[in-house]
From Swiss-Prot:
InterPro entries for the chain: ACP, ACP-like_sf, PP-bd_ACP, Ppantetheine_attach_site
Annotated ranges, domain Carrier: 1-76
Cellular compartments annotated: Cytoplasm
Keyword Acetylation part of the UniProt annotation: no
Chief place where the protein resides: cytoplasm
Pathway listed: Lipid metabolism; fatty acid biosynthesis
Keywords from the UniProt entry: Cytoplasm, Fatty acid biosynthesis, Fatty acid metabolism, Lipid biosynthesis, Lipid metabolism, Phosphopantetheine, Phosphoprotein
Keyword match Secreted: no
Family per record: Belongs to the acyl carrier protein (ACP) family.
PANTHER family, per the entry: ACYL CARRIER PROTEIN (PTHR20863), CARRIER DOMAIN-CONTAINING PROTEIN (PTHR20863:SF76)
A GO cellular-component term linked to this record: cytosol
Purpose of the protein: Carrier of the growing fatty acid chain in fatty acid biosynthesis.
Protein name per Swiss-Prot or TrEMBL: Acyl carrier protein
Length: 77
């Protein structure tokens, strides 16, 4: 759950959303109101937080918070 909490913190900071609104099933664009620029900035913030590089081809697949958590866990962070 630690990865989720860290992801949630980044999402809350980047998108200025209520922490209660960020759930594993939340979709970044549809549910949390992000636009394409928000998504780019979110990916950059996640890369910095977790010290990883997320290629554009992978970033496009990160639709929900669960997708983000799974991806970061897969990288072993």
């Amino acid at each position: 759950m630690a990865v989720f909490e860290d992801v949630r913190d980044v999402v809350v900071e980047q998108l200025s959303v209520d922490p209660q609104a960020v759930k594993l099933e939340s979709k970044i664009i549809e549910d949390l109101g992000a636009d394409s620029l928000d998504v780019v900035e979110l990916v950059m913030a996640l890369e910095e937080k977790f010290e990883v590089e997320i290629p554009d081809s992978e970033a496009e697949k990160l639709v929900s918070i669960q997708d983000v958590v799974n991806y970061i866990e897969k990288l072993g962070k």
